[in-house]
Every structure is written in structure tokens, then in C-alpha cells.
Design a protein with these regions (language model features):
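Generic protein-terminus/edge-of-domain signal
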Residues: 1-40
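Short, Lys/Arg-enriched, Trp-marked, Pro/Gly-tolerant hinge/linker segments that flank
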Residues: 98-101, 121-128, 140-166, 170-185, ...
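Conserved metal-binding segment of the jelly-roll/cupin
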Residues: 39-52, 66-69
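A hydrophobic/aromatic-rich effector-binding and dimerization subdomain
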Residues: 56-116
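Short beta-strand His + acidic residue motifs that chelate non-heme Fe in jelly-roll/DSBH
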Residues: 29-31, 47, 52-58
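Short hydrophobic/aromatic patch on the recognition helix
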Residues: 192-196
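Amphipathic, well-ordered alpha-helical segments in soluble domains
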Residues: 19-22, 106-110, 132, 136-139
């Protein structure tokens, strides 16, 4: 948890870290995978170790929550809140979340508890940090579900889209055609195309 990600080059170079960048006030100008973007106050962006990030301008207050998959034991968690979940593999573009007042208050509460937990030196600290991280991820996952309009009965359909992007990350060097990914998912290319259209991807 840091409010000075831009001032620590080692964090920027670490390719094992998942990140949430949360602009709490003002703006933050970033370059994500060679695309410049300006985040506004209140926005939260989840990023994977594959993203290349450069902070171009800080004009406010922001917080970066960083973790690696070993800390979170991520692959043992439910798919939707894992590193292969909706936040990190929900679509081809960077997910920008805009929490409402209630969710913003929840994120502030979680961030405050995370900061407080870092100050405690005991054997329970690591587990408490994991629990708080999961709360942060679940809160952001709910925001992403609303953004992608994933209705309660439609999770399975959207899960196919998520699995597609996980496979693309794994096999993009050797597999270039949608048909190849459709085969891996045991679906037809037309089914995938219809799902992408349904979710505006």
C-alpha cells in the first residue's frame, strides 16, 4: 500500500505485482501499455503484471495497492475474485471503475484498515492483510459487474468471455485466430462473437 508509487522505480519494474491504482482526489496521468490516460478523482484501475505503467503527472492524491499471486494464494480462490477473474481478465481494455459514495466509503475503510494492519507486528498480520485485500477485490468486482452489466443469471455467459481473455494471455504467441480459442473453450466462433457483442467488447 503506497501513495508514492511514482517515486519508487523498483515497484514500477517489478513484473510480479498486481495493482489497484485509486485516485482519491485530483487527477493522475498514466501511460498504460504505451497509451496515455488520465484518471479522475474517484476512479480505480486494476492492472496485471503484464501491464507496463509509467506515471506521467500527479495532480492530486492517489493510492496504489500492490500484491503478488503468492501472497493472495490467488489461484485457489473463486475464479471471479482471482487473478484470472473479472477485474484482471474481463476484457481487452483497462477496466476503469467509478465507485458511488457508499462504495467509496467502503474502499476508504478497507484502505485505512490495511494501513493500520501494517503497523501491527504479530503472527496474524499476514492473514488479516489477505482478508482485507479480498474485501477490496470483492468491492471492485461488484463495481465491474455493474459496469459490464453482468446480470445475476448471466455470470456463466460472461465467464466464457473471461476465460477467453485468460487463454489469450497464455497463448497469444502461438494462437492468432479466434477459432483456435473457440476450440479450447469448446464453443463455436459465432458463440464467442455473440457474447462479445452482448457485453460491448
Amino acid at each position: 500500500l503506497t501513495d508514492a508509487f511514482h517515486a519508487d522505480p523498483a515497484l514500477g519494474r517489478d513484473r510480479s505485482l498486481y495493482k489497484f491504482i485509486w485516485v482519491r482526489s485530483g487527477t493522475l496521468r498514466l501511460e498504460i501499455d504505451h497509451v496515455e490516460t488520465t484518471l479522475e478523482a474517484g476512479e480505480v484501475v486494476p492492472l496485471t503484471p503484464l501491464h507496463r505503467i509509467a506515471v506521467r503527472e500527479v495532480a492530486g492524491d492517489y493510492l496504489t495497492l500492490l500484491f503478488n499471486s503468492n501472497f493472495y494464494c490467488i489461484y485457489g480462490h473463486d475464479d471471479e475474485v482471482s487473478c484470472n477473474g473479472l477485474l484482471f481478465n474481463g476484457g481487452p481494455e483497462t477496466v476503469r471503475l467509478r465507485p458511488d459514495a457508499a462504495r467509496t466509503a467502503a474502499l476508504y475503510e478497507i484502505a485505512d484498515k490495511l494501513a493500520g494492519e501494517y503497523a501491527i507486528e504479530d503472527s496474524l498480520r499476514e492473514e488479516m492483510l489477505r482478508i482485507l485485500l479480498k474485501r477490496f477485490i470483492i468491492t471492485c468486482t461488484r463495481l465491474a459487474r455493474e459496469r459490464f452489466a453482468v446480470a445475476p443469471g448471466k455470470e456463466k455467459a460472461f465467464d466464457i468471455v473471461r476465460q477467453y481473455y485468460v487463454l489469450v494471455d497464455e497463448h497469444f504467441r502461438e494462437k492468432k485466430q479466434v477459432q483456435e480459442y473457440a476450440d479450447l473453450l469448446n464453443r463455436s466462433p459465432k458463440t464467442l462473437s455473440n457474447l462479445f457483442a452482448a457485453y460491448g467488447l
